[in-house]
Amino acid sequence: MGEPGFFVTGDRAGGRSWCLRRVGMSAGWLLLEDGCEVTVGRGFGVTYQLVSKICPLMISRNHCVLKQNPEGQWTIMDNKSLNGVWLNRARLEPLRVYSIHQGDYIQLGVPLENKENAEYEYEVTEEDWETIYPCLSPKNDQMIEKNKELRTKRKFSLDELAGPGAEGPSNLKSKINKVSCESGQPVKSQGKGEVASTPSDNLDPKLTALEPSKTTGAPIYPGFPKVTEVHHEQKASNSSASQRSLQMFKVTMSRILRLKIQMQEKHEAVMNVKKQTQKGNSKKVVQMEQELQDLQSQLCAEQAQQQARVEQLEKTFQEEEQHLQGLEIAQGEKDLKQQLAQALQEHWALMEELNRSKKDFEAIIQAKNKELEQTKEEKEKMQAQKEEVLSHMNDVLENELQCIICSEYFIEAVTLNCAHSFCSYCINEWMKRKIECPICRKDIKSKTYSLVLDNCINKMVNNLSSEVKERRIVLIRERKAKRLF
């Protein structure tokens, strides 16, 4: 049996058996039965079928073979797998038998780029049967029988097949619509001074001096001296100045409302672009982002104009205060105060509307930025997946669909009676010298053209680089020309 450290067959009746223990897991162990050949791969005719969830093509159809030599020692052989078999961190040569011992480390395949370890790592060990049995991986024939039983009992309903489904409009859209509806309500002048408590950050700090009193709820005005009398001409002059101020506020209010309508239209456009961004329309996203920036600039300009009008209003108030000094009429004072109070209420209503519009616009910009980031991440993920699929497809073409004679992808694939496939031109040239299969050396009795294999190769080549396509076209033309001569 060799040295004590060699990996030799255990006696299950004695309570101990040899197995490949899955590193870091209490399941998926592979039992090595005495006198049995153990094959591992992703195909159907193996002892243990391993199907990678991360990379389906990591494990070949018949990846490796484990069996005993005449002395009873277990060995492992790489059966020409794509990603190789590793014994103690060293890759094995294909079709060469290696002895394995207690504590040896076996790795099937290679780690992915973002992983440190491979998905299938095992350690050669001998354990008690009671310890091994709960952790064993089911054999392929057992899994087939189990799947047949489940398939006869399985019934799906529409409710089971229907997932949570696509949700309705996004929370972001409903939230923005809610804010827009709130800000779109008509502004009513209230005597209690219910105005925005937080002015815009871009406004002049002087405006805070006009903030309503928190205790009384009424606006606080600069000191107005008591007036006892006024001439009719002076009263008319002061009234016309107040009317002009009110007119200016009304014009500003109409501009703000127009700007809000533009923001609502832009919001609808953003939601429409959201659907287009899912299809990869990045140009439309960039254009919409530029339009949003232009709208923000327009809002800032309107805010600056409003600040200038407020300063002009303060100047008007000071001038009216100077005119009112020394005037002695109670009725004129009362009328003027009412007009000034109304003007200030409209001013604060305008400021509140401006703040709401600013918040709505900032919410739209934040939502758009978030959507752009998500779109970029999804595009990068899709590109990475596409490159991975092309890489795997190229590996499959190179390892499974190449002619062993010319080392090119099959051109007019022909399958012999021994089930090996070659190019039609290559096997015809070979048969001029020998009437036997180049791989298994069996006599060639029949040849069958495989149209399915040709169509599959042509479709897969269409997804490869232009160099591969051009080379294949040149080879097809050369072989057709040689066939004519």
Swiss-Prot record:
Belongs to the RNF8 family. SUPFAM superfamilies: RING/U-box, SMAD/FHA domain. Residues 181-220 are annotated as: Disordered. Gene3D superfamilies: 1.20.5.170, 2.60.200.20, Zinc/RING finger domain, C3HC4 (zinc finger). One of its GO terms (cellular component) is midbody. It is an enzyme of class 2 (transferase). Ubiquitous. In fetal tissues, highest expression in brain, thymus and liver. In adult tissues, highest levels in brain and testis, lowest levels in peripheral blood cells. This is E3 ubiquitin-protein ligase RNF8. Autoubiquitinated through 'Lys-48' and 'Lys-63' of ubiquitin. 'Lys-63' polyubiquitination is mediated by UBE2N. 'Lys-29'-type polyubiquitination is also observed, but it doesn't require its own functional RING-type zinc finger. It catalyses: S-ubiquitinyl-[E2 ubiquitin-conjugating enzyme]-L-cysteine + [acceptor protein]-L-lysine = [E2 ubiquitin-conjugating enzyme]-L-cysteine + N(6)-ubiquitinyl-[acceptor protein]-L-lysine. A zinc finger (RING-type) spans 403-441. It is found in: Nucleus; Cytoplasm; Midbody; Chromosome, Telomere. One of its GO terms (biological process) is protein autoubiquitination. GO terms for molecular function: chromatin binding; histone binding; identical protein binding; protein homodimerization activity; ubiquitin binding; ubiquitin protein ligase activity; ubiquitin protein ligase binding; zinc ion binding. Homodimer. Forms a E2-E3 ubiquitin ligase complex composed of the RNF8 homodimer and a E2 heterodimer of UBE2N and UBE2V2. Interacts with class III E2s, including UBE2E1, UBE2E2, and UBE2E3 and with UBE2N. Interacts with RXRA. Interacts (via FHA domain) with ATM-phosphorylated MDC1. Interacts (via FHA domain) with 'Thr-4827' phosphorylated HERC2 (via C-terminus). Interacts with PIWIL1; leading to sequester RNF8 in the cytoplasm. Interacts with WRAP53/TCAB1. (Microbial infection) Interacts (via FHA domain) with phosphorylated human herpesvirus 1 ICP0 protein; leading to RNF8 degradation by the proteasome. Pfam families: FHA, zf-C3HC4_3. The FHA domain specifically recognizes and binds ATM-phosphorylated MDC1 and 'Thr-4827' phosphorylated HERC2. This domain is required for proper recruitment to DNA damage sites after UV irradiation, ionizing radiation, or treatment with an alkylating agent.
